[in-house]
């Protein structure tokens, strides 16, 4: 299993919109993908504009297949629209 962690920095006052987009757009889209395991949007209690998006797939090939879909090209920009920037790091779950 692989897990992708994306540290997102929401634009000022965009946190609620980012959370809504995750719940209503991104999570339903990614959860329907073959090989999908789990996703969560985490917000540290001490930082209002910082988030961690965690996405897990059975394999890296499954994740890359999702990234290559038209649906991903529709929903990911909706997440990015609420962000000032982000950094991603991939992990193998052991």
Model features per residue range: what roles?
Residues 1-3, 18, 34-36:
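Short, flexible segments with low predicted structural confidence
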Residues 2-9, 40-67, 92:
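Short, well-ordered beta-strand segments in beta-rich or mixed alpha/beta enzyme
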Residues 9-22:
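Short, surface-exposed ligand-recognition loops at beta-strand->loop->(often short) alpha-helix junctions
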Residues 20, 44-50, 78-85, 93-94:
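Noncatalytic linker/hinge segments flanking ATPase motor cores
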Residues 24-37, 56-90:
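An amphipathic, aromatic/His-enriched active-site/gating alpha helix that lines ligand/cofactor pockets
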């Amino acid at each position: 299993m692989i897990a992708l962690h994306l540290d997102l920095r929401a634009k000022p006052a965009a946190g609620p919109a980012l959370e809504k987009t995750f719940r209503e757009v991104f999570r339903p889209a990614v959860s329907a993908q073959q090989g999908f395991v789990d996703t969560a949007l985490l917000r540290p209690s001490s930082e209002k504009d910082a988030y961690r998006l965690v996405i897990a797939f059975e394999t890296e090939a499954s994740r890359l297949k999702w990234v290559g879909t038209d649906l991903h090209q529709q929903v990911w920009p909706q997440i990015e629209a609420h962000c000032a920037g982000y950094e991603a790091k991939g992990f193998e779950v052991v």
